[in-house]
């Protein structure tokens, strides 16, 4: 019944100690809608066709974003969860300062002021 690969640590962070103990210690299976309600899932698809559409839509949205910013944001969010606040703030500040000098940063600003979609290059 012991979760592997850090599952016990992750589930506590996602749904809290009480729910995690109930679910993990009793080996409870959580239905999809309940998993969404308690924060284990962000969305639920009614069938495989809808799931495929949701995945394509999600991937399209991610693909339209600035890749350097997304990579940095992932690191910042992970630091926010795993580090003291002072460390997380340092990681965020350093990441922001580094991104300010990229071509993608300027493309985002220019696209906003020109009221057009940005064309990010990952540079």
Model-derived regions, located:
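C-terminal long alpha-helix characteristic of the crotonase
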Residues: 41-90, 119-123
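CoA-thioester-processing core
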Residues: 1-24, 38, 54, 58
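Acidic, divalent-metal-coordinating active-site segment for phosphoryl/phosphodiester hydrolysis
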Residues: 27-34
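Structural motif
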Residues: 38-39, 115
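Interdomain hinge/lid region at the active-site interface
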Residues: 101-105, 111
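Helix-loop "lid/cap" segments that line or gate small-molecule binding pockets
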Residues: 23-24, 76-80, 95-100
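Terminal peptide-recognition signature
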Residues: 11, 35, 73, 112
